[in-house]
C-alpha cells in the first residue's frame, strides 16, 4: 500500500510562517502526498508552487469551530477555489447538530457542496470528540444526503482526534462510495495503518514524513 497517496500533509497552526508552509509543500512534492492541507491564506502560494505536481491543494472552511454562517462558508469555498484549492475540508455546525436542527446542518453542508461543485472535493469535519455515537451517525448521514465526497473525524483543534472505532462507525454509516478521513493524533505508521484497516481512505497528518518513513518517534503536533 502506498500510504503517501492517502495522506493530506497538513499545517494548520495559527503561527505557521511562509517558511513553514513552503517546507510542507516541498515535502509533499518529494513524498508525493495526496495533498497539502493549509489555511486559506496560503492557498494561492500552494497552488502556484504545486502546479505540474500530482498533489492537490486542500484548505479548511469554517475552521476550526464550524460556527460561521452558511453564507460565509459558501463564500470561503468559492474564494478558496478561485485561488486554486481543489479540495475543501469544512466544519459542520456542531451546535445545530446537538440541537437536533438537522435541516440547518444539511443546508450548511449542501451550500458548500454547491459552491464547490465540479471544482473541488468536499470533506465534512464532524468533530467526533464532541459527539455521541448517535450524533456521529446523524452527521454522516446528513453529509451524504447533502452530497459530500468525504466525512472527516476531527479538526485537530478540539478535545480529541481520530479513533479506529469512530472510523469504523463512519465507514459503516456512509457505505463504500463516500470517503472517510482520519485526522487528529495520527502520528505514526502504526496509527495510520490502524485507521486504514478500520475503513479510512484518507489520513490527515502533520507527521506525514515520519509516517511514510515509519519513524516511530512521529511528531508532537495534535494534527
UniProtKB/Swiss-Prot annotation:
Major site of localization recorded for this protein: cytoplasm
Enzyme class: lyase
Domain of life: Bacteria
GO MF annotation terms: deoxyribose-phosphate aldolase activity
Keyword DNA repair: no
Presence of keyword Transmembrane: no
GO cellular-component term (any): cytoplasm
Catalytic residues (UniProt): 89, 152, 181
SUPFAM superfamilies with a match to the protein in the record: Aldolase
Pfam families for the chain: DeoC (PF01791)
Gene3D superfamilies on file: Aldolase class I
Enzyme Commission number: 4.1.2.4
Residue ranges of coiled coil: none
GO biological process: one example: 2-deoxyribose 1-phosphate catabolic process
Pathway: Carbohydrate degradation; 2-deoxy-D-ribose 1-phosphate degradation; D-glyceraldehyde 3-phosphate and acetaldehyde from 2-deoxy-alpha-D-ribose 1-phosphate: step 2/2
Protein's cellular compartments: Cytoplasm
Keywords: Cytoplasm, Lyase, Schiff base
Catalysis performed (reactions): 2-deoxy-D-ribose 5-phosphate = D-glyceraldehyde 3-phosphate + acetaldehyde
HAMAP family: DeoC_type1
Assigned protein family: Belongs to the DeoC/FbaB aldolase family. DeoC type 1 subfamily.
Functional description taken from the UniProt entry: Catalyzes a reversible aldol reaction between acetaldehyde and D-glyceraldehyde 3-phosphate to generate 2-deoxy-D-ribose 5-phosphate.
Protein name: Deoxyribose-phosphate aldolase
Originating species: Bacillus cereus (strain Q1)
Name of the coding gene: deoC
Amino acid at each position: 500500500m502506498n500510504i503517501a497517496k492517502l495522506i493530506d500533509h497538513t499545517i494548520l497552526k495559527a503561527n505557521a510562517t511562509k517558511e513553514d508552509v513552503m517546507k510542507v509543500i516541498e515535502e509533499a512534492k518529494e513524498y508525493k502526498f495526496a495533498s497539502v492541507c493549509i489555511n486559506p491564506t496560503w492557498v494561492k502560494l500552494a497552488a502556484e508552487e504545486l502546479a505540474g505536481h500530482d498533489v492537490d491543494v486542500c484548505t479548511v472552511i469554517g475552521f476550526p469551530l464550524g460556527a460561521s454562517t452558511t453564507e460565509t462558508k459558501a463564500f470561503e469555498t468559492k474564494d478558496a477555489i478561485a485561488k486554486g484549492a481543489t479540495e475543501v475540508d469544512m466544519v459542520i455546525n456542531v451546535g445545530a447538530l446537538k440541537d437536533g436542527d438537522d435541516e440547518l446542518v444539511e443546508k450548511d453542508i449542501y451550500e458548500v457542496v454547491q459552491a464547490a461543485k465540479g471544482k473541488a472535493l468536499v470533506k465534512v469535519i464532524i468533530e467526533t470528540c464532541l459527539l455521541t455515537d448517535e450524533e456521529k451517525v446523524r452527521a454522516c448521514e446528513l453529509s451524504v444526503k447533502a452530497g459530500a465526497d468525504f466525512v472527516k473525524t476531527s479538526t485537530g483543534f478540539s478535545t480529541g482526534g481520530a479513533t479506529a472505532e469512530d472510523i469504523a462507525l463512519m465507514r459503516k454509516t456512509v457505505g463504500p462510495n463516500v470517503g472517510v478521513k482520519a485526522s487528529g493524533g495520527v502520528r505514526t505508521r502504526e496509527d495510520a495503518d490502524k485507521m486504514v484497516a478500520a475503513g479510512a481512505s484518507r489520513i490527515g497528518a502533520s507527521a506525514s514524513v515520519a509516517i511514510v518513513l515509519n519513524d516511530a518517534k512521529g511528531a508532537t503536533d495534535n494534527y
